[in-house]
Amino acid sequence: MSKQSFDFKRYKPEAPSGSRKRPLKKFKKPIRIKSEDQINYKNVSLINGFISQRAKILSRKVTKLTWKQQRLMSVAIKRARILSLLPFIVKTKFKKLY
């Protein structure tokens, strides 16, 4: 039994040129926190940029914050919710289909 060299590259399927397997996701532009901006529950205008339309806290992937900034932001959002400066949930009215 003789061992022959097998060319794997010859049998590898080639992807069409210029095509991607998965489309790229479009994220919202990150909001940059300036050095003079303080992450505080009273700063509602800054906090509003870090919650979604459904009043959920956005992830670090979307906001591009550091670990420390994300933790401070989530604590500030939770405090603002308790003091009713921000809503816990956003109630949307659904249209009836019939």
UniProtKB/Swiss-Prot annotation:
Keywords: Chloroplast, Plastid, Ribonucleoprotein, Ribosomal protein, RNA-binding, rRNA-binding. InterPro entries: Ribosomal_bS18, Ribosomal_bS18_sf. Residues 1-26 are annotated as: Disordered. GO terms for cellular component: chloroplast; mitochondrial small ribosomal subunit. It is found in: Plastid, Chloroplast. It holds the Pfam family Ribosomal_S18. One of its GO terms (biological process) is translation. Residues 1-13 have a biased composition (Basic and acidic residues). The keyword Cell membrane does not apply. GO terms for molecular function: small ribosomal subunit rRNA binding; structural constituent of ribosome. The keyword Chloroplast applies. Its main location: plastid. Belongs to the bacterial ribosomal protein bS18 family. HAMAP family: Ribosomal_bS18. Part of the 30S ribosomal subunit. This is Small ribosomal subunit protein bS18c. It comes from Gnetum parvifolium. The gene is rps18.
